[in-house]
Every structure is written in C-alpha cells, then in structure tokens.
Amino acid sequence: MSVSFEKKETNRGVLTFTISQEQIKPELDRVFNSVKKTINVPGFRKGHLPRPVFNQKFGEEALYQDALNNLLPNAYEAAVKEAGIEVVAQPKIDVVSMEKGQDWTISAEVVTKPEVKLGAYKDLEVSVEVSKEVTDEDVDARIERERNNLAELVLKEGPAAEGDTVVIDFVGSVDGVEFDGGKGDNFSLGLGSGQFIPGFEDQLVGHKAGETVDVVVTFPEDYQAADLAGKEAKFVTTIHEVKEKEVPALDDELAKDIDEEVETLDELKEKYRKELAEGKEAAYKDAVESAAIDLAVENAEIVELPEEMVHEEVHRSVNEFLGNMQRQGISPDMYFQITGTTQEDLHKQHEADAEARTKTNLVIEAIAKAEGFEASAEEIEAEISSLANDYNMEADRVRQLLSEDMLKHDITIKKAVEVITSTAKVK
C-alpha cells in the first residue's frame, strides 16, 4: 500500500492511498460470484454465467463499485494508521483512478484532531457550593417525605386548601361552545399539583363539597391544541368531595412502616444520616471533579476546533435524546408537535453543550497522552468485569460490544480525570 498525507490547512488535509491488485482480484471474484446469482442471460442458467461472458457483456468495470465498497473500510483504516494521523470526522472519499489491472488510487479529504496546548491541570484551586455536612434538618426532611408518602386521604368538611385533593366534575367551553377534551367526571385533582391550566386549581381553593364554581382561565399561547391557544375558557366545576392528607404519627411504629430493618425512630434517623452522608460525599466529589475539569479546560488552548467534531457530537446527543423520548412512548414527530419545535431547533439547543463536551474530551485525552497513561491487560480485564457487573451481562458480551481500543481509551481517560481531581484543592 502506498500512502501519503498532504496537509492543506489547520486540522485538514488529503490522504491518498492505493489498494493493491493482490486485494482487488480476489474481491472482484467474490463480487462476481455473488452478482452472477442475480442476473439472467439467455443461454445460461442463473448462477452459471462464465466470467468471460460477463466481462464481454457487461464489462469487468461493472464489478468495481461493489468491490471498492467492500475493500474501502479496511484500506482507509490502514492508510490512516500508516499516515500516523488521528481523524475525527467522516472523510470525503474520491476515486483518483480505477484502471484495469492497476492498483486503485483513492483520496480522502480528512479532518484531523486539533492540537491541544495544555495549561495547568494539577494542583488546581477550585470552589464548590456543595456541602458534605448532614444536618438534623436534612434527616428530618427525608423522614417527613416518607411520612407524607404513607399519608391517607380523608374526607374534609371545611373549604379546600392548597395541598388538598378535590373530586370534581367539570365542563369546559369557549364562547359558550363545549370543546373536545374539556369534560371530566369524578376527577381527582390535587390542588397545587399543576395538573390543570394555570389558574384553574387556585380558583377551587376556599370552596367546599357540594359547591359549583365557574372557573375562568386562559389557555397558554403555546398550548398544544392550536384552536384553543390563547383563548379564554369557562369550566363549570362541581366539587363532590374535599380530601386532606392525614399523616401517621412520628413514632417508632412509623419508623418500622418506613423501613422494616429498623425498630425505632432513632435507628431510622441514624440510618438516613449515614445514607445522606454517602450521597453528599459523592455529590461533593462530583462537584470538585466538574470544577477541576472545567478549570483544566479553561487553562488549555485548542487550536481551531473543527466544526465537524461539534456537528457529530450534536448529532449523537440529539439521537440519544430522541431515543430516550422514544423509550418513554414519545416519537420524534410527537415530540416536535408537542413542543412546537423542529429538528433544526433541537440541534441548535444541543450545540453549546456539544461544543463544551468536545473541548473537554480533547483536553482530557491530551492530558492522558501527556502523562503517558496506558492500560494494562489486568486493568482491561478489571474494566470488563466492572461493566459486566454494572449492566448485568456476561464478560464475553462486553468484549463483543467494546473493542480493546475502546476499553484502553476509557481506562486512560479515567486516569487523566483522577490526576486532575486528586490533586485539586478546594478553596
């Protein structure tokens, strides 16, 4: 293989390489053996067309494109490796020559990894607003949340208040005409839950069971039903029941109801204190890590970040976001309809974060390279075991999904992050 790389401008160049006849000939044979099964030529059974007849009738060149498609990925990868460049975006491929009996010459316009000039990344002084301290108020708030989860709704004779639940019938109309979706019977509505249009729940506060209330609201301008957006509506609402939460007493019995592993309220408080301490410690470490990495990135200089890198990260991020929506039962079309946005809008929303992530990744990779970090066979096996445990799959399945190069990369990145964070000092 002949390989050359000509730098055209910062982070861009043309990679030229050849595919030898030793590779081309057997691939043409494979393509022909596949193609001949699909074509009909009078006088020959399908699949039994001789090669000379094919060449005479169609020309050997008819096989070239399929053969090139099959050979190109490995040839390109080998050329990149031999040229000693790091490519960060999809190349623009061009065929220079494909002469019969000659090596094929291919050119690829490539975008290369930008130079990163590192600044300080060790012994950084950072500020974080996350506290590791667990207060009595933190513990009490956790118990109160669990206590409220065990609360029961009981009928209330007095007027409805914020936090109460009302059981209602309602009929909505605009200019005296009822509309689809504006009617409900025996609907349980938590006052203050924000389930209904802004202003609806507030107008039921202070009213008792048996009362009928004319609730007047205005639909938001961006309401999903365009025919109702921005319009004033009246909901004739009848309150059947008012219910309030009745929380259990704060005692040892409550503690046992919350957690069967404890016997007393004091034991529950101690358990929660330890759990909260672990959570706050983890949050504190994450905050220090984030602040230190941000400062290391700020101290570095990236020489002309290629827009293609950012575009690819935006594309990956948007696909991940829409995939998450899909798993929640919301298709891309449904999401864009509900939000009133477009694919282009979504890409723009992700651009800033995508650029920041791209810069961060480049700086951390540069630190790993500067430190000479590598991944040993033992570390790779440990990483495989850890991933298998985290995702509840066999180690061999992890090996199938992740190449050794990917695992090595992840391990060296973790080491670089550890260098940044372990030496950081909190002001």
Curated annotation (Swiss-Prot):
Reaction(s) catalysed (UniProt annotation): [protein]-peptidylproline (omega=180) = [protein]-peptidylproline (omega=0)
Primary localization class, coarse: cytoplasm
InterPro entries (UniProt xref): PPIase_dom_sf, PPIase_FKBP_dom, Trig_fac, Trigger_fac_C, Trigger_fac_C_sf, Trigger_fac_ribosome-bd_bac, Trigger_fac_ribosome-bd_sf, Trigger_fact/SurA_dom_sf
Entry's EC annotation: 5.2.1.8
Gene3D superfamilies reported in the protein's UniProt record: 3.10.50.40, Trigger factor ribosome-binding domain (3.30.70.1050), Trigger factor, C-terminal domain (1.10.3120.10)
GO cellular component: cytoplasm
Cross-referenced HAMAP family: Trigger_factor_Tig (MF_00303)
Protein name per Swiss-Prot or TrEMBL: Trigger factor
Organism encoding this protein: Streptococcus gordonii (strain Challis / ATCC 35105 / BCRC 15272 / CH1 / DL1 / V288)
Species lineage: Bacteria, Bacillati, Bacillota, Bacilli, Lactobacillales
